[in-house]
């Protein structure tokens, strides 16, 4: 564990802005004694919210005033060129300058992707950054799914690099040296899928850096068959949101059924420890926080509609990645690849 951690938060992003990000920030600094948070956004709004929580004078909550906000309607190019004093841009600049070790935002995904790429730059050798997040499975450990929407279409080399970065993330998070990596496809047979997926499969199969186990279908995501599942951003984003929607549907239907009859209510009371455990297992809030990997800094993207609890989960994810020194670990792997390629030339 590092002695002191500093994380910059985009307080104004997302559907709820400070209404969810400020309670999350207060809870996070209370949970982590070594954590300081720089709250980037409208000082007046932030101060008022902190005061309502009796936390205005908290020594580890530092307000950094920003005069602009990147809205959900803002186009990525406009955000990069014109929103230089936005809460998102200031938070990323703090990571670039070294004043903060990570940035967390629930703002406009496209704008965050382009702005983070522009401000922090790519790690040497990495073609494209990717969004990666944990998804619950039937087994004890989650599966790490990437890309979740940063890149709509990916060529074979990019998918291969995602496999490498996913292996590093899963290896660090799960504490395993050789995480199992799979490509998401429309079938498990070698002949299935388009040409980029087939070529990516060959690259992964031949690589000593990846423990490639073959293709996975959509139904395999939850089985725990793989530790890492790689896909294009369009597919990954649809898959993730479908997973979250199904989880909410099941829990809502289950809750409605229990409340319908007195007998079911009595059963629910007796089974409440099991029900709570199940809900905790599938609740999307605890998995909130997709990491934008491949950059020279740590950026965690929270859901735009994140509750305070969910936004705190994204902060917790950023804390873990700082402690694991994730960008350095990824950079070291790509440096080995570059050194090997140089020797072979």
From Swiss-Prot:
Keywords: Cytoplasm, Lipid biosynthesis, Lipid metabolism, Phospholipid biosynthesis, Phospholipid metabolism, Transferase. It holds the Pfam family FA_synthesis. One of its GO terms (cellular component) is cytoplasm. Pathway: Lipid metabolism; phospholipid metabolism. Homodimer. Probably interacts with PlsY. Belongs to the PlsX family. This is Phosphate acyltransferase. It comes from Pseudoalteromonas translucida (strain TAC 125). The lineage of its organism: Bacteria, Pseudomonadati, Pseudomonadota, Gammaproteobacteria, Alteromonadales. The gene is plsX.
């Amino acid at each position: 564990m590092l002695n002191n951690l500093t994380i910059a938060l985009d307080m104004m992003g997302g559907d709820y802005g400070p209404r969810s990000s400020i309670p999350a920030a207060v809870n996070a600094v209370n949970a982590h004694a070594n954590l300081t948070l720089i709250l980037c956004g409208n000082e007046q709004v932030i101060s008022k919210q902190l005061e309502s929580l009796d936390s205005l004078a908290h020594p580890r909550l530092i307000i950094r005033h920003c005069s602009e906000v990147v809205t959900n309607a803002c186009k990525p190019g406009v955000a990069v060129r014109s929103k230089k004093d936005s809460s998102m841009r200031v938070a990323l600049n703090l990571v670039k300058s070294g004043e903060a070790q990570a940035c967390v935002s629930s703002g406009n995904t496209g704008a965050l992707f382009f702005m983070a790429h522009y401000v922090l730059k790519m790690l040497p050798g990495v073609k494209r950054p990717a969004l990666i997040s944990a998804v619950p499975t039937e087994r004890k450990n989650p599966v790490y799914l990437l890309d979740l929407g940063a890149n709509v279409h990916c060529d074979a080399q990019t998918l291969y690099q995602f496999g490498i970065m996913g292996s590093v993330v899963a290896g660090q998070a799960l504490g395993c040296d050789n995480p199992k990596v799979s490509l998401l496809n429309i079938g498990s047979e070698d002949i299935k899928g388009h040409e980029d997926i087939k070529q990516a499969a060959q690259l992964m199969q031949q690589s000593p850096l990846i423990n490639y186990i073959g293709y996975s279908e959509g139904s395999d995501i939850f089985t725990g068959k793989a530790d890492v599942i790689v896909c294009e951003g369009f597919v990954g984003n649809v898959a993730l949101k479908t997973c979250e929607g199904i989880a909410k549907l099941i829990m809502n239907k289950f809750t409605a059924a229990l409340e319908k009859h007195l007998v079911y209510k009595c059963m629910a009371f007796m089974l409440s420890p099991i029900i709570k455990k199940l809900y905790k297992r599938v609740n999307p809030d605890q998995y909130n926080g997709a990491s934008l990997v491949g950059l020279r800094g740590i950026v965690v993207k929270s859901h735009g509609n994140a509750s305070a609890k969910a936004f705190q989960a994204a902060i917790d994810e950023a804390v873990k990645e700082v402690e694991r020194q994730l960008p350095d670990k990824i950079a070291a792997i790509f440096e080995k690849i570059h050194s090997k390629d140089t020797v072979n030339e």
